[in-house]
Amino acid sequence: MIPVSRFFTVQDPSNALLSYTQKGIDFFEKLGQFSKEKAAIEEEYSTKLRSLAKKYAKKSEEDDEILKSVSYTSSFNSFLQQLDQIATRHQTSAEHIRGGVVSYVASKTCQMRSSRKNAINDLKTINDKLEDQINEMCKSGKCYLKSFKDAENSYQKFYKADKNLEISRLELEKARALANARNEACELAKQDYSALVRKTNAEQKRYHVELLPVIFARLKAVDKECIADMRQVLQKIVSFDDSLADSTEECRKIMQREVGKIDAEGDAQLVLKSVEATIEQPAPFEIEDLGDPKNCDSRTNDSADGSGGKLLKSSPSKNRIIRNFLGILKEKEADEKPEASNNDQLMYTDKSKPAHVRLSCLRSKIRDMEKQLEQAIQGREGITRLQQAYYTNPQHGNPSACTEPLISYAKKIEKLKMDIHNLKEFYAMLEMSVEEGQERSFGGRDTPDTTRSMSGSSTNQSSSKTIEDVLSGEAGNSSSADDSSKNILRQLFTTPKRLISSPKTSKSSTPTPLRRRAEISSPKILRSSFSGAIRKSLSTPDSVKVETAVTVTALFEFAKSSAETMSIEQGEILLVLEHDHGDGWTRTKNCRKHNEESGFVPTSYLQFPQ
């Protein structure tokens, strides 16, 4: 008989092949996990690198104009920009790996697992079919073996009965007939077994020659595809790294070029010139003539008699000489404070000084005033808390004692806010004029400029002054820091609109209002505050008509001061013709039947409907 164990010898190579294919797919999936973690590392590195560049870019933003002008600051800013570009390249590489490798590995892994599973199912099917055929053959062999043994026993009994003379002839014939019948049954079982053996052999041959090689070929294709995908994935990762290296190499070349632009001699010379520009020329030392030493007796007698003799001046100390040389005045002496204020004012009004020095001095003045404002606000809050504590516990103190300090703080805060606001507006104008190449001139008219100006009024009536002329004239007349700031800005901010004439529009001598500055050239930048925040000035029509009639009530009396203004009385009903554009003036028309008049009035004098 054919041993059944011969079939199961095929299972060992099949299991080994299936195990190897599974390990290949697992390894391919591990490459996908590796790519995913590599992309995460690239993304994390990009985030940290971008945060680093952003952090030091903020630290490099200095308020000092000198540091903004030196080459190493601009080079370092360019260096940080390229560093941010490198971070962007790493971010892009991570996105490419995540989109081109990780997703590809995931889809191919599912596809190969499905192909392997189908091959395993087909292999199991042909194995089961061959196993059933072998089991049927074995069952037929058992039947043939049983029939053979039965026939053999029948013939042994027949031969034994034939030798026994005591057995009748009838019993002998029965034994012979039984043996022959058993022999025929054995022959039939043998034929069935032989047929099943031939069929099983044919099926086994077909299994090993036709079916099994096909399954192995399919598993081989899966394994081959898996290995090819491994190579493709690794090549993609290398190509992404090569692209990243090329792009970062370009950024590093730009970094080297920007670093090479650092000029040590030029930066040092620029700083030196800026510092020298801030040094005031000190007054020359005067020779103190003490007189003739021979007249010492007369000077002694004069002093003894009480007559007014000449007092010997003490020689200046070393510190005072150094301060005099550097142009630094004592701030501790009360009589020298106005002079120091005038010197600071002349610092940013002197046209011969560099622009960044003038802006820096003005910025320092505004910063000092903001510190004073903050201290005043904190003092008022402290007095308010103290007064509240007195109200809560009257035994601790009298709450009315805090009223006078609160009023004083309120006046001081209001005054500081007004001065800071005026200086900030002046700073914005000065900075804008410096950026455009030369300082714009502004008019001193008392009425707003409008395209609907009344007949007979001329926009050329006001005389234009430069910023330096106004500031220099006010600097000579001011006596203190606060009065100086008021006098400086008196001509700047008492008119409804500041009139600015652009150097690019030399064809017309008519000043242009600030709110229609955008018509000079496009685009223009309107600096709205000292903080440096800018907004683009949108082009608007020269005059905005009021679509619906708006009536307002005059709160106070106002006297006409120029051709474009009008007089109003308290409680008078007015009709609004043009709204306030931010300059503090509104064009209105009275409702008088016999004396109809229109013109500009202060917006704060009007009460608008709710």
Swiss-Prot record:
Q: Which GO terms describe its biological process?
A: embryonic ectodermal digestive tract morphogenesis; endocytosis; negative regulation of protein localization to adherens junction; positive regulation of clathrin-dependent endocytosis; positive regulation of egg-laying behavior; regulation of actin cytoskeleton organization; signal transduction
Q: Which InterPro entries match?
A: AH/BAR_dom_sf (IPR027267), F_BAR (IPR031160), FCH_dom (IPR001060), HR1_rho-bd (IPR011072), SH3-like_dom_sf (IPR036028), SH3_domain (IPR001452)
> Would I find Phosphoprotein among this entry's keywords?
no
Where is coiled-coil annotated?
355-385
Q: Which residues form the SH3 domain?
A: 547-610
| One family name in Pfam for this protein | SH3_1
Residues of the region (Disordered) are 283-315, 436-487, 499-519
Q: Where is the REM-1 domain?
A: 352-429
- Result of knocking out the encoding gene: Double knockout with toca-1 results in nearly 100% of mutants with defective endocytosis by oocytes characterized by either reduced or non-detectable yolk protein in the oocytes and by an accumulation of aggregated yolk protein in the pseudocoelomatic space. Double knockout mutants with toca-1 also produce 20% fewer eggs compared to wild-type animals and there is some embryonic lethality whereby the dying embryos display defective morphogenesis including failed epidermal enclosure with extruding gut cells and increased width of the intestinal lumen.
Quote the biased-composition stretches of kind Basic and acidic residues, using this chain's numbering. Answer: 291-302, 437-449
| Domain spans labelled F-BAR | 1-267
Comp. bias (Polar residues)? 475-487
The record's subcellular location field reads:
Cell junction; Cell membrane; Cytoplasmic vesicle; Cytoplasm
Q: Which SMART domains match?
A: FCH, SH3
Hey, what's the signal peptide range on this chain?
Answer: none
Indicate, by first and last residue, each region the UniProt record lists as having compositional bias (Low complexity). Answer: 453-464, 501-513
Question: Major place of localization?
Answer: other
Keywords, A to Z, come to: Cell junction, Cell membrane, Coiled coil, Cytoplasm, Cytoplasmic vesicle, Endocytosis, Endosome, Membrane, SH3 domain
Keyword Transport found? no
The way this protein sits in the membrane is described as:
Peripheral membrane protein
**Domain of life the protein comes from:** Eukaryota
Record's subunit section: Interacts (via SH3 domain) with wsp-1 and abi-1. Interacts with cdc-42 and (via SH3 domain) with wve-1.
What does the similarity note say? Belongs to the FNBP1 family.
Name of the protein this chain belongs to: Transducer of Cdc42-dependent actin assembly protein 2 homolog
